[in-house]
Amino acid sequence: MVNSKGEITDSDPGSNHLLLNGLPDKAGKNQDTEPENSLCSQYEEKVRPCIDLIDSLRALGVEQDLALPAIAVIGDQSSGKSSVLEALSGVALPRGSGIVTRCPLVLKLKKLLNEDEWRGKVSYQDFEMEISDPSEVEVEISKAQNVIAGEGQGISHELISLEVSSPHVPDLTLIDLPGITRVAVGNQPADIGRQTKQLIRKYILKQETINLVVVPCNVDIATTEALSMAQEVDPSGDRTIGILTKPDLVDRGTESKVVDVAQNLVCHLKKGYMIVKCRGQQDIQDQVTLTEALQKERDFFEDHPHFRVLLEEGRATVPCLADKLTSELITHICKTLPLLENQIKENHEKITEELKKYGSDVPEEEHEKMFFLIEKINAFNHDINSLIEGEEFVGEDESRLFTKIRNEFHKWSCVIEKKFQQGYKAIYKQIEKFENRYRGRELPGFVNYKTFEIIIKQQIKELEEPAVYMLHMVTDMVQAAFTDISEANFAEFFNLYRTTKSKIEDIKFELEKEAEKSIRLHFQMEQIVYCQDQVYQRALQRVREKVADEEKNKKINSMSSEEVSSVNISLSEIFEHLLAYRQEATNRISSHIPLIIQYFILQAYGQKLQKGMLQLLQDKDTYNWLLKERSDTSDKRKFLKERLSRLAQARRRLAKFPG
């Protein structure tokens, strides 16, 4: 029997020999103990470190960031789930009607090889309690559930951890989940069934979880909710183990069907099935100890005509189940460790980058706040300077601001060319009108300067509004870029961000107005038709040479009338002058307007904004106001730091793990 320290006493006939999991093996009590000690030593070296590693990561809270290898125990109500866990752990867990397990229970079993003392520990939230007697476990778990989930019948997703260290338990960690319920009873929430399934699915959905499905032998396995849920998340059965309970309640004549299920012939699972017989309610009333129940279980299978074969195949009894679960868990851990290490590394890098967005904590001391604000403003000004110099960092699929502005300037050149081309259509009508109505004593071919002046002024005037439109386009682009930099640097400081955004807006209106004034002034000056004599003469010469070359390639046809010849001669002459002047005007306008925009909207805008930001440092009384963080920023930074700390510790532990 088990004494107050959880030890198996000599009165138990099967206690002379223990399996690796610490449970009695009647068949092996005459074997030599020396090989066993050697095997136990190897087992301890390989098994315990693996389980301890995952348990330590779970204790760090790493499971909040990514899934850890685990065995989750699920079953319908009254499936015998609690009895299986009791048999494995050697301690009594809460029992009763309705939902008994109301919080996920992490059951950490640690086998002690060189100690006889039983030790237990319950921990949840910020509470931790050492337990010295196995009989206290049930009460403490019930207390923990009441604290977390309330006194009623509700459930909670919050974990309770129970650690049991004893020579008579296997090295194993299990997560016990609430039993599946269908109908709310008593003071249970009306949607208790949905809540329970949602909690169970949260665990069994993870690919890192081995699902341990507890099913009574005396029900149709195809109708059990637990197995159905496991099949939904693991249709191939790769990570599901079936546990058949209550074989003593099977109707006579149906034993062969149970054997077929246990031998994986009915509902196939790659990890197979195990069958166990745990303490029933009558055994508990008769005060049958867990150790005595294990011996009764073995006797049951040895003497049963149908189920004996399952014992011989290693598919029956709690000790065999413990060995299988430990073996499966270790294999699963070793298989997932490389992936887990990569996931932790990737998460660590991702959170490190995310934390950079939130910057450092605001200092408490006033003089430190000044340096902190200076550092923030200097970083902002550096980013603004990089932007106006065309040296800012951009992503792979992004373009620098100056590249976008240059594209607008290129469009401007195209607009100038298009406007001049469209203007030529009006020239024919202008000259024809002059020739037919207003030509006086002038001989054919003499250009009327006034006509030339009117045409060129009108063409240039039509470019004024497109130039102003381009100014507004570029201004909006620069303002948006400055605002993005402000958000990147000051997003967590609402007042500082709002102040900076206000400065960006005010300076924009001021300089955009000045730039527009300069552009309109330029177009007013362009209404004076002027070009340096030598510059114009060279331009006219180039045009005439080009026209002469084109004429050589054409056949000269005689005109039918003098009037047509007169118009042609006038057109040819005025076109040459228009093209010559247009070349010089185009050079001036296509370059000077972008220069005005660059000066006011990029250089002056950026410089004035940087000076305005530095002026914020002059008023020390506003430091606290400017550096007041958004309500959620500090919490988010703290949350990210905690995650980063967890993952950093996890990386160190994985690095030290011998593998």
Swiss-Prot record:
Nucleus is among the record's keywords = no
Spans annotated as Bundle signaling element (BSE): 339-364
Q: Does the keyword Membrane apply?
A: yes
Stalk as annotated region, ranges: 365-629
| Residues recorded as bearing N-acetylmethionine in the entry | 1
Q: Looking at the record, which segments are called G2 motif?
A: 100-102
Q: Where is this region: G5 motif?
A: 277-280
A single GO CC term, please? cytoplasm
Q: Tell me where in or outside the cell this protein is found.
A: Cytoplasm; Endoplasmic reticulum membrane; Cytoplasm, Perinuclear region
Outline the segment boundaries, as ranges, of region: Disordered. 1-40
Extract the ranges annotated as region (G3 motif).
176-179
Kindly give the membrane topology term recorded for this protein.
Answer: Peripheral membrane protein
Q: How is it modified after translation?
A: ISGylated.
Q: What induces it?
A: By type I and type III interferons.
Q: For the region Middle domain, what residue ranges are annotated?
A: 364-531
Q: Which PROSITE patterns match?
A: G_DYNAMIN_1 (PS00410), G_DYNAMIN_2 (PS51718), GED (PS51388)
Residues of the GED domain: 571-659
Region (G4 motif) location: 245-248
Q: Where is the signal peptide?
A: none
Task: Print the keywords alphabetically.
Answer: Acetylation, Antiviral defense, Cytoplasm, Endoplasmic reticulum, GTP-binding, Immunity, Innate immunity, Membrane, Nucleotide-binding, Ubl conjugation
Region named G1 motif: 75-82
In this chain, the stretch annotated as Critical for lipid-binding covers 552-555
Q: Its family? A: Belongs to the TRAFAC class dynamin-like GTPase superfamily. Dynamin/Fzo/YdjA family.
List, alphabetically, the PANTHER family matched.
DYNAMIN (PTHR11566), INTERFERON-INDUCED GTP-BINDING PROTEIN MX1 (PTHR11566:SF217)
Comment block on domains = The C-terminal GTPase effector domain (GED) is involved in oligomerization and viral target recognition.
User: What's the name of the protein?
Assistant: Interferon-induced GTP-binding protein Mx1
